[in-house]
């Protein structure tokens, strides 16, 4: 079961004045990947590493990514990774990624194709009471890249 839901992007218009005051101290910007939103965490019910959509639907056909992240979650069982299932080579074929990750009963061929094509790009974590700057540092420290993890 998914523990928390991710923060979604909002239109700046209504918050423009408030945000402008906040911007005086700096601003963080991340590129937007047009992939499939994915939250990865150690499940609270059965302790397996699982992946979910932003609405809580479990993604089943990305075992290669979950297996790779097992050691991370052994060390940090309460962290939730927030990112996109994406492949830059498929940026014009978004439907291909969706069709691969939405499979609820993947065949061996589906699993192999997912292994070949679907990557997880991590750009944040969900960690209570930790500001973005510290979360971004955490992602960089553990995955070696500012804003993104490529598996």
Across the structure, where does each feature detected by a protein language model lie?
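Covalent nucleotidyltransferase
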Residues: 17-150
């Amino acid at each position: 079961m998914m523990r928390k839901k991710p923060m979604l992007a909002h239109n700046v218009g209504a918050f423009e004045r408030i945000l402008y005051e906040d911007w005086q101290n700096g601003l963080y910007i991340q590129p937007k990947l047009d992939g499939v939103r994915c939250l990865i965490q150690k499940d609270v019910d059965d302790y397996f590493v699982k992946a979910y959509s932003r609405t809580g639907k479990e993604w089943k056909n990305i075992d290669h990514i979950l297996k790779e992240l097992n050691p991370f979650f052994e060390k940090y069982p309460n962290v939730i990774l927030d990112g996109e299932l994406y492949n830059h080579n498929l940026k014009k074929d978004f439907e291909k990624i969706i069709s691969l990750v939405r499979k609820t009963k993947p065949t061996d061929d589906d699993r192999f194709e997912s292994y070949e094509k679907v990557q997880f790009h991590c750009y944040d974590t969900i960690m209570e009471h930790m500001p973005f700057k510290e979360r971004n540092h955490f992602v960089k420290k553990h995955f070696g890249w500012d804003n993104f993890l490529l598996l």
